[in-house]
Amino acid sequence: MSHQHTEELNDQQIVRREKMEALTEQGIDPFGKRFERTATSGQLKEKYADKTKEELHDINETATIAGRLMTKRGKGKVGFAHLQDREGQIQIYVRKDTVGDDNYQIFKKADIGDFLGVEGEIMRTDMGELSIKATHITHLSKALRPLPEKFHGLTDVETIYRKRYLDLISNRESLERFITRSKIISEIRRYLDGLGFLEVETPVLHNEAGGAAAKPFTTHHNAQDMDMVLRIATELHLKRLIVGGMERVYEMGRIFRNEGMDATHNPEFTSIEVYQAYADFEDIMDLTEGIVQHAATAVKGDGPITYQGTEIKINEPFKRAHIVDLIKEVTGVDFWKEMTLAEAQALAQEKNVPLEKHYTSVGHIINAFFEEFVEETLIQPIFVYGHPVEVSPLAKKNADDPRFTDRFELFIMTKEYGNAFTELNDPIDQLERFKAQAAAKELGDDEATGIDYDYVEALEYGMPPTGGLGIGIDRLVMLLTDTTTIRDVLLFPTMK
């Protein structure tokens, strides 16, 4: 929504436009052109960190920097200012008798928010601040709007999320958090590429939602006159590539789920899915641990991390436990015993576990017990494995106890960070499970998906035993940046 057309220009905006016109009259483009820097603020601070005022005077080195004008003060023929680039701020010191009259006017007329290029000598002030004594100033771009009043530490969350650029200008820790996000993503790619995985791209527009339990966004392809959905997962396409012989593949990208928003859910989010032929879920536990630990080390070093005041031993081997053992530990209820649905329902009522209409088997109730009692107790990294077959439609059954699957979820600080399993590669079993999902959908489970016959056909050509994994990147970034809401790790979160 643009408010520009109805908004009256305020005094500041009028003055800035007049200054823009004055620059044009002087033959200076108010919006500048290419500019060659020799250094950034961070490079200069690092290079000259241990040099005294006198040493800098003797070395007499020069540099050219560029950035946004953030502070400005001075009287008459001398001025001080701070320029901000991606790495931080550096002070500039401007004297009329050094830069000359015309050049000094450019500095004098510059507004907070404008971009300037500054060439000059590296020095330290009497206060000990590393600065550049300008020999020449170049106007690079005019800001026609002043930054918001409280731009040193913008706190209005509406503005932070709607106008992220203002947040990045004014909140250093916010910019750092997004730089960290980029580093985490690069490190995960680097780690997987090093293990021989291929990064692939599969369609965002699907004919049938599949690969996860979620409500899709629907759209329409006009030329083909067909309804389509935005992907809720990349799973079924990636497994087709395993059928095709690609052996080790991953895809990192946006997933779309037409569901509620809260501190850990945004309708579009980033996930990575990884598939490895000839592996099982235990191999994938090792791989998952490797991905998470490499990402953590890249941005936090190789010790434990702190999340909201709790120390997380992310650098140590992750605990591994069966879902049924954990339920027994927390509630005393033992689901290893064979039992009827009625017996399980009675246990649920006894423990006040809410029952849904589509809970048609013991497996559904086991899962409900886990969500109700166990999740909130899981603080340190743990692989919870052995989920019931009814809630794991794409995972292989456990050979020793077919009520359960060779599946795990990674939990840290009560939240799920990853979901993985030995993939179901039996097309007959897969079709049965798709049919069970379709039946659950009929009973009102709006997260259940339909039947993907094309995928079943792919499996009929033969898929090697395979292990697969999905990790929510946004949640991982939240964990590694000690952030409590997903909106703080998405540059442009969905807003009403």
UniProtKB/Swiss-Prot annotation:
Gene Ontology molecular function terms on file: ATP binding; catalytic activity, acting on a protein; lysine-tRNA ligase activity; magnesium ion binding; transferase activity; tRNA binding
Residues involved in Mg(2+) 1 binding: E409, E416
Entry's Gene Ontology BP terms: lysyl-tRNA aminoacylation
Keyword Ligase: yes
Cited SUPFAM superfamilies: Class II aaRS and biotin synthetases (SSF55681), Nucleic acid-binding proteins (SSF50249)
Flavoprotein keyword on record: no
One Gene Ontology cellular component: cytosol
Keywords: Aminoacyl-tRNA synthetase, ATP-binding, Cytoplasm, Ligase, Magnesium, Metal-binding, Nucleotide-binding, Protein biosynthesis
Location of this chain's protein in the cell: Cytoplasm
Co-factor: note: Binds 3 Mg(2+) ions per subunit.
Reaction(s) catalysed by this chain's protein: tRNA(Lys) + L-lysine + ATP = L-lysyl-tRNA(Lys) + AMP + diphosphate
Coiled-coil portions: none
EC number: 6.1.1.6
InterPro entries referenced in this protein's UniProt entry, alphabetically: Aa-tRNA-synt_II, aa-tRNA-synth_II, aa-tRNA-synth_II/BPL/LPL, Lys-tRNA-ligase_II, Lys-tRNA-ligase_II_N, Lys-tRNA-synth_II_C, NA-bd_OB-fold, NA-bd_OB_tRNA
Oligomer status and interactors: Homodimer.
Family: Belongs to the class-II aminoacyl-tRNA synthetase family.
Protein name: Lysine--tRNA ligase
Species in which this protein is naturally found: Streptococcus mutans serotype c (strain ATCC 700610 / UA159)
